[in-house]
Design a protein with these regions (language model features):
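Extended, well-ordered protein cores
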Residues: 1-9, 19, 154, 230
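Beta-sheet entry/capping signal
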Residues: 4, 134-135, 142-146, 219-224, ...
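Extended, highly charged clamp/arch subdomains and adjacent linkers
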Residues: 5-7, 14, 21-150, 157, ...
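Acidic, glycine-enriched catalytic cores built around paired aspartates
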Residues: 65, 143, 148-150, 155-157, ...
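Flexible, glycine/threonine-enriched loop-and-boundary segments that flank and lead into catalytic domains
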Residues: 237-238, 348-353, 461
């Protein structure tokens, strides 16, 4: 799915089956603990008639539970009952008769025990433990964790092209595809041409979603995310394919999917409000939304927008898109939930969650926050129980405060918006001039970073580059950021920001920009992130990597050095500091302590790269050593992609 050929309908089913086994095993263990704890004797404490009836019923159909319980436990009804629940959970795990068909059946059993405890002097004799078990069942069901499904919009177009026998479908104007989709949905027309294996496999995903929801509950599957969405036609395409897969409601014709467009380029973010308005004007989709509670999720992508336009233009496009989405949703009378698809590093939107919450536009967070947590940073935030609890506490506190004070943020001064627009526009121009407009830049990038090693390491769930393209545009965001991190250029985290600040200071004045730093959390946190990336940048180390590119490509390195010097000068001026990160001494000290250990690994990596490339990239021993340096530098910097 979305670039990973190993993810398909079978993967969804197998993943949820494994989820079920994990959570059912956990429930089974908790039942054993409850059976040990709730040892009340029927000679002293009564039980409800409903519980007594259930125990008798299960005694007849669950002989295994009866055989496992010692005879002396016969007069301990709660112990007997939770043993019976455990037997049903065991049957659920093994797929035997008498298994729980859904978590509601388990909840009914546990609830019966809770009611009996309340009725029979058990409020302080196990009731809390049983209620806690009920909360866990309500939270995790039999699905444990909700799966979102992501597919690229182009894949949907290819399947529709096959099904309609229209080879030029992907190349059609968006307006024409939208018109035809509108007509196909109105006529409920199925495919008129046979699908190949890839097309059938795409429809099997929809069938797997329907089966998963039937077996594991409605919460087993979350959003169906359409990546690289450009307009309403990319969302309507999903509704059409759902009909072709025959998973729609036979009575109403509505799809059981929550479809979320992923806006991951600057152009689509700039049109975010118009896209949502156009989508809400489509009769078929408006009926679909009504059936889903008039709730629409939109995913905004931090990673590819940064690769496309640099950090300042990316962050501003994301901010403006959120304002537009909130306004469009208000006009349409629906609720929009913004899903922040961010990466692990500041260049890809990473950082403290509370900073993200504080920086979003007023009203963008009302009791709910959806964001991605990248695998490479999960251990930092959740690896130890105390750290995980601290992460959750800080996240909950920030969301609670944002919700409580929604509608109270002062309006953004026009002067601040104008200055930020200037920063974004000028930084975008500087970034694109280097990355996309400079001859030989991609050759320089490949030579002056260990990208060729990273590509062969097969890190992550998808190939390093998208099929059918070349250059920076085809490269995925993770290897793009990771390669610059390894060489200590850290370019995606700061390049262009200095040029943007120069333009803003010249056109709008020092006072306006200083006010933005002091009173606008969005800009303050952007400045924090840029300064942190500048603090990790080491152009002395980077110069050794630049030497690998040779004299013919040295002009690229000079442009980077000039922009770095400009950006550092402006950041220090705005901070009123003599050194980078004087305002964050903890991070400053951490970098200073780590550098002596990391720097030798960089020098080793440069030497190994030179030797490995001379062998035609065939020497496996050198490649193994390069892998070790990449891992060591990543651990030392605590940063990947």
């Amino acid at each position: 799915m979305d670039g990973n050929p190993d993810v398909h309908g079978k993967t969804i089913r197998e993943t949820l089956h494994r989820h079920e086994q994990v959570i059912v095993s956990t429930y089974f263990a908790e039942c054993g603990q409850l059976a040990e704890t709730l040892s009340q004797s029927a000679n002293r404490v009564g039980v409800s008639a409903a519980l007594a009836a259930r125990i008798d019923s299960y005694s007849a159909i669950l002989p295994g539970a009866q055989a496992l319980a010692p005879a002396r436990h016969d007069r301990m009804p709660y112990r007997v009952f939770f043993g019976q629940i455990g037997e049903r959970l065991k049957a659920t795990y093994e797929g035997r008769p008498n298994a729980y068909q859904n978590p509601d059946e388990l909840l009914a059993d546990v609830g019966c025990a809770a009611d009996s405890l309340l009725e029979n002097r058990g409020r302080h004799a196990g009731y809390f433990l049983v209620r806690r078990f009920m909360r866990r069942v309500r939270t995790f069901g039999f699905h444990l964790a909700t799966l979102d499904v992501t597919q690229h919009a182009h894949v949907h177009d290819q399947v529709i092209a096959q099904g309609l026998g229209l080879a030029d479908w992907p190349a059609m104007a968006p307006e024409e595809r939208l018109r035809q989709l509108r007509d196909l949905l109105a006529r409920d027309q199925g495919p008129t041409s046979a699908l190949d294996a890839i097309g059938r496999r795409s429809l099997w995903v929809f069938e797997a979603i329907a089966q998963a929801r039937h077996k594991f509950g409605g919460r087993a599957i979350g959003e169906y995310i359409v990546s690289a969405a450009q307009g309403p036609e990319d969302v309507l395409a999903v509704l059409l394919l759902a009909r072709w897969a025959d998973i729609t409601d036979k009575r109403t014709g509505e799809s059981p999917l929550d479809v979320a467009p992923l806006l991951e380029c600057i152009d689509s973010l700039e049109r975010a409000g118009d896209i949502l308005r156009a989508l809400c004007r489509e009769p078929a989709y408006r009926r679909h939304l009504a059936a889903r509670g008039n709730r629409q999720m939109v995913v905004i992508g931090y990673s590819d927008t940064n690769k496309e336009g640099g950090i300042a233009a990316s962050r501003w496009a994301l901010q403006v898109a959120q304002v537009q989405l909130l306004e469009a949703a208000r006009e349409a009378g629906i609720k929009v939930l913004i899903f922040h698809g961010r990466g692990g590093t500041p260049a890809r939107g990473g950082g403290r969650t509370e900073n993200l919450v504080e920086a979003v536009p007023d009203g963008a967070i009302r009791g709910v926050l959806r964001l991605t947590e990248q695998g490479e940073v999960v251990n930092q935030s959740y690896g130890l129980r105390p750290i995980a609890m601290r992460t959750l506490e800080r996240t909950f506190a920030s969301v609670a405060l944002a919700t409580a004070h929604a509608g109270e943020k002062p309006p953004l001064p026009p002067a601040h918006a104008a200055a930020m627009q200037t920063i974004a526009a000028r930084s975008l121009a500087a970034y694109r001039e280097l990355v996309f407009g400079s001859a030989g830049f991609f050759d320089y990038f490949r030579a002056a970073t260990p990208l060729d090693v990273i590509e062969r390491m097969h890190i992550g769930s998808r190939p390093a580059a998208r099929a059918g393209g070349d250059g920076v545009r085809a490269l995925r965001a993770i290897p793009w950021v990771f390669a610059w991190t390894q060489s200590r250029h850290m370019l995606p985290g700061w390049f262009g920001f200095g040029s943007g600040l120069s333009a803003a200071l010249e056109q709008h004045g020092d006072d306006v920009v200083a006010q933005m730093v002091a009173h606008w959390p969005f800009f303050g946190h952007l400045l924090d992130d840029v300064e942190a990336m500048l603090g990790r940048t080491d152009l002395t180390i980077a110069s050794h990597y630049d030497a690998l590119a040779g004299d013919a490509l040295r002009a690229q390195a000079e442009v980077i050095r000039r922009e770095y010097a400009l950006t550092v000068a402006h950041v220090l001026r705005l901070r009123g500091s003599a050194r980078l990160l004087d305002s964050d001494p903890t991070l400053q000290r951490s970098i200073k302590l780590r550098n002596p250990y990391i720097d030798p690994m960089h020098l080793m990596q440069v030497d190994l790269l030179q030797r490995w490339r001379k062998t035609g990239r065939e020497d496996r021993a050198l490649f193994g050593a390069l892998r070790a340096t990449i891992s060591g530098i990543a651990q030392g910097l605590q940063a990947t992609g």
